From Swiss-Prot:
Keywords: Amino-acid biosynthesis, Cytoplasm, One-carbon metabolism, Pyridoxal phosphate, Transferase. Pfam families: SHMT (PF00464). The keyword Transmembrane does not apply. This is Serine hydroxymethyltransferase. Catalyzes the reversible interconversion of serine and glycine with tetrahydrofolate (THF) serving as the one-carbon carrier. This reaction serves as the major source of one-carbon groups required for the biosynthesis of purines, thymidylate, methionine, and other important biomolecules. Also exhibits THF-independent aldolase activity toward beta-hydroxyamino acids, producing glycine and aldehydes, via a retro-aldol mechanism. The gene is glyA. It comes from the Bacteria. It is an enzyme of class 2 (transferase). One of its GO terms (cellular component) is cytosol. Belongs to the SHMT family. Its cofactor is pyridoxal 5'-phosphate. The record marks 229 as: Plays an important role in substrate specificity. CDD domains: SHMT (cd00378). Its EC number is 2.1.2.1.
């Protein structure tokens, strides 16, 4: 039925051009969005495989459809590798995304209207941690904690006071824009004081956790969620982990299926299995060490150029640049740096006076640039280029000069050679 003539190129010119243009953009731009990375050709191969054809409601060995014996192998591989990677007793690889993983955990542990606590979005949290525009803030009563306005660090004493006041049923420890180590033991202590479940969302730092460069929450949290992309460098998807607890495990399984989802995406699960196998290799730890070194180098260079970093530094792959004292908005900075072929994202900073559509900060991350092969030398050059642009976001001649340098560096370090 299908032969090699069935290609997008020969069928859909508009879509083919969009894909080709995106491939060129990835090669000709330096990616500094903290939540993005480049997957390996092996991951791409799995995700584009015939496993996309197979419907497989249920779990390995307990499917509602026949013909699942081979996709069962893929899912069992993903599960066993994730258990080994994170030291977890239970793993569910079926969530389509990190947000759906978080939603499944909440469905398993909470009832509509229950109170839970999460980090405020402007302070570095995530939409699913209680934002009023998200399901988490609509279906449940969310109480937000934040960072100290002077230090930029989580104020655990204030968090504890809020917990004692509101008696949440669940506390979420996690972030999308926080550059420091979370004190899992303190979170556990606070949760125990009020009889709350503790959920850790490690979507941003999962790769660092997997190799021991960031403390693991698995021994402390009742449930851990993550995405499988970002620092983990796998396909876009979600993952749920926990230590041994038969009651919670059963709740999580039924919450994911049939509670949240129908058929799992078996081609994505196969891609997760490949990514987890890659993450178990010694070179993955070397990569994560470089991610961390690059983030610290970027932080140091930008500080030397007069830019404020929220919390004063970084312990992971990201940093949050506070532009309030520079008199420019995150939106302006994002656009200007983008014109130099450096991709970043505007981001709110703690106590930001501007709206989330404008913001007063930039979030920068090093996972993708490190995958590309950048080390301290390249990151130093790159960080200075970012500062050059930010020094005058309206100087198009300077932006053009930086863009030329970016293109030369991109050719030296292709993504897919």
């Amino acid at each position: 039925m299908f032969d090699e003539s069935y290609s997008i190129k020969n069928f859909d010119d508009v879509l083919f051009k969009a894909i080709s243009d995106e491939k060129r953009r990835q090669e000709e731009h330096i990616e500094l969005i903290a939540s993005e990375n480049y997957v390996s050709p092996r991951v791409l191969e799995a995700q584009g495989s015939v496993l996309t054809n197979k419907y497989a409601e249920g779990y390995p060995g307990k499917r509602y459809y026949g013909g699942c014996e081979f996709v069962d192998v893929a899912e069992e591989l993903a599960i066993s590798r994730a258990k080994l990677l994170f030291g977890a007793h239970y793993v569910n690889v079926q969530p389509h995304s990190g947000s759906q993983a978080n939603a499944a955990v909440m469905m398993a542990l909470l009832s509509p209207g229950d109170t839970f606590m999460g980090m405020a979005l402007p302070h570095g949290g995530h939409l699913t941690h209680g934002s009023k525009v998200n399901f988490s803030g609509k279906l449940y009563h969310s109480v937000e904690y934040g960072v100290d306005s002077n230090t930029g660090l989580i104020d655990y004493d204030a968090l504890e006071k809020l917990a004692l006041q509101h008696k949440p049923k669940l506390i979420i420890a996690g972030f999308s824009a926080y550059s420091r180590i979370l004190d899992w033991a303190r979170f556990r202590e606070i949760a125990d004081k009020v009889g709350a479940y503790l959920m850790a969302d490690i979507a941003h730092v999962a790769g660092l956790v997997a190799v021991g460069l960031y403390p693991s929450p698995v021994p402390y949290a009742d449930v851990v969620t993550t995405t499988t992309h970002k620092t983990l460098r796998g396909p876009r998807g979600g993952l749920i982990l926990c230590k041994e607890n038969e009651e919670i495990e059963k709740k999580l399984n039924s919450s994911v299926f049939p509670g949240m989802q129908g058929g799992p995406l078996m081609h994505v699960i196969a891609a997760k299995a490949v990514a987890f196998a890659e993450a178990l290799l010694p070179e993955f730890k070397t990569y994560q060490q470089q991610v961390l070194a690059n983030a610290r180098t970027m932080c140091s260079v930008l500080q030397s150029r007069g830019y404020d970093i929220v919390s004063g530094g970084t312990d992971n792959h990201l940093l949050l640049v506070d532009l309030i004292n520079k008199g420019i908005t995150g939106k302006e900075a994002d656009a200007a740096v983008g014109r130099a072929n450096i991709t970043v994202n505007k981001n709110s900073v703690p106590n930001d006076p501007r709206s989330p559509f404008v913001t007063s900060g930039l979030r920068l991350g090093t996972p993708a640039a490190t995958t590309r092969g950048f080390k301290e030398r390249e990151i130093t050059l790159l960080s200075n280029w970012v500062a050059d642009v930010l020094d005058n976001v309206h100087d198009e001649t300077n932006i053009s000069r930086v863009k030329t340098q970016v293109l030369l560096l991109c050719r030296e370090f292709p993504v897919y050679a």
